[in-house]
């Protein structure tokens, strides 16, 4: 197969903050209340520092080469992109250095890592599974979308290993370690059906479970297709957008089309639905669940407008395009407690809505960081589930078209944000409330595969 890998680009040795299309537009009252300060063409709270930025570079710098999700392992960050993925050395977070950039088009290239393996989600028909395959749209043959698997033992030269086709492709996937230590499972989420498509037949009220033998990744295959709901959701759309697993607790929370779903994953191949929750008044597109450390709360997001609309402007209700905080009881039942939305009003042409985030490992507190597209990066304290509040933020000014932070995750003392058009941002929060998190070091992070930290 054709695989273009660009390794060790020295241009990243001295990353600089790029100029945005225009100046920031933070609501003055919100900025003042947060102790905001300006830094070049960005605005941030006084407790947040913009440490570094690595702008997009070839071959992942085309007009549709959008930055997407993130994963971490040791001193490396892995950044998905509509056109492939990048590997960065972040041993010095102030100077991220490119190790390799792999050209492998397939939107949206949602990414995860485990040991020497890297996984990518492809949710757009291709003429084949390899990286050289053309798009299957616009009259092409179509016929493949799903999961691509790479060997990353040599991070300067990632190697394509195999691929697995899944119905309706893979919009996102969640890595769940097998209990025998010899396999990992990927819970594959995607919307559907598409009646005219050869890759997404009706009905589509399910997910796909892909089993990957870690010693033989070429043997990866679909081992089950659990049905999570009866029929398709609203407007005939079924399936799930994404799933967050908490393997230690044998739990997963799925954000699906029409509802949130709590699952028992003690049997990795056959997850069992425990509860459906709906919010017909405030939620549109369920998205991005996050458990707290004790698994006594779950935060769901509402991606109203699909990430391309302005839902943080004055014309959108504060509980729309927001987060909802649920209690999770010992009996494993969800109960709605409160809502959160960033307090900084955005312009009517800035795409902004709740998106991907992760916990900060602060003992005794429930704190997470989250991306909000052009609304920036928000640090949220939801310890009081009835009254979640923002305690820090980072935000650029408006850009033309779709932009902003796709994913923002905390990893070993820093926040890493994948900006759709501006590249990789590294942030640091210095605050007595969050400083205990700096003492916690982990070896690997896939944000949708939660692990516990010391209480």
Regions found by a protein language model. Name each.
Residues 3-5, 9-455:
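Feature marking well-ordered beta-strand scaffolds used for ligand recognition
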């Amino acid at each position: 197969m054709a695989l273009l890998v660009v390794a060790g680009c020295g241009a990243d040795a001295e990353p600089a903050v790029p100029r945005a299309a225009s100046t920031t537009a933070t609501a003055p009252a919100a900025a003042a209340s947060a102790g905001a300060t300006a830094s070049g063409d960005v605005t941030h709270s006084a407790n947040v520092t913009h440490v570094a930025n690595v702008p997009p570079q070839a071959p992942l710098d085309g007009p549709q080469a959008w930055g997407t999700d993130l994963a971490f392992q040791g001193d490396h960050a892995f950044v998905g992109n509509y056109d492939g993925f990048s590997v960065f050395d972040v041993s010095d977070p102030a100077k991220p250095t490119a190790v390799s950039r792999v050209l492998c088009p397939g939107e949206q290239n949602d990414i995860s890592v485990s040991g020497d393996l890297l996984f990518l989600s492809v949710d757009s028909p291709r003429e084949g599974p390899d990286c050289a395959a053309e798009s299957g749209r616009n009259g092409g043959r179509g016929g493949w979308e799903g999961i691509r698997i790479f060997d990353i033992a040599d991070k300067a030269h990632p190697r394509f290993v195999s691929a697995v086709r899944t119905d309706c492709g893979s919009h996102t996937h969640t890595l769940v370690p097998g209990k025998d230590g010899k396999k990992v499972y990927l819970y594959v989420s995607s919307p559907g059906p598409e009646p005219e498509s050869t890759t997404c037949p009706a009905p589509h009220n399910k997910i796909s479970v892909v089993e990957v033998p870690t010693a033989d990744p070429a043997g990866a295959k679909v081992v089950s297709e659990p049905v999570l709901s009866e029929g398709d959701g609203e407007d005939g759309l079924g399936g799930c957008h994404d799933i967050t697993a908490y393997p230690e607790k044998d739990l997963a929370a799925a954000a699906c089309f029409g509802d949130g779903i709590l699952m028992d994953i003690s049997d990795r191949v056959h997850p069992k639905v425990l509860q459906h929750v709906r919010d017909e008044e405030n939620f549109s597109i369920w998205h991005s669940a996050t458990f707290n450390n004790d698994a006594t709360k779950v935060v769901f997001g509402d991606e109203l407008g699909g990430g391309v609309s302005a839902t943080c402007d004055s014309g959108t209700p504060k509980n729309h395009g927001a987060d909802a905080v649920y209690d999770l009881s010992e009996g494993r039942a969800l109960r709605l407690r409160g809502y959160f939305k960033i307090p900084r009003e955005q312009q009517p042409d800035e795409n902004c809505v709740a998106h991907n985030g992760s916990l900060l490992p602060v003992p005794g507190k429930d704190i997470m960081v989250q991306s909000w597209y052009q609304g920036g990066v928000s640090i949220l304290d939801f310890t009081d589930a009835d009254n979640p509040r923002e305690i820090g933020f980072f935000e650029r000014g408006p850009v033309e078209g779709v932009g902003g932070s796709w994913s923002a995750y905390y990893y070993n003392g820093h926040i890493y944000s994948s900006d759709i058009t501006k590249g990789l941002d590294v942030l640091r929060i210095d605050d007595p409330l969050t400083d205990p998190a700096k003492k916690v070091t982990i070896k690997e992070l896939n944000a949708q595969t939660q692990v516990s930290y010391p209480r």
